Amino acid sequence: DVPDSLDWRQEXLVRK
């Protein structure tokens, strides 16, 4: 489940 925004990648890096 990934949003169309590229923010998910940045958040992933921040969260992980």
Swiss-Prot record:
Molecular function as annotated in GO: cysteine-type peptidase activity
EC class (word): hydrolase
Sorted UniProt keywords: Hydrolase, Protease, Thiol protease
Coiled coil feature spans: none
GO biological process, one term: proteolysis
EC number(s) given by UniProt: 3.4.22.-
Domain of life, per lineage: Eukaryota
Assigned protein family: Belongs to the peptidase C1 family.
The name this protein goes by in its record: Putative cathepsin-like enzyme
Organism name: Fasciola hepatica
Classification of source organism: Eukaryota, Metazoa, Spiralia, Lophotrochozoa, Platyhelminthes
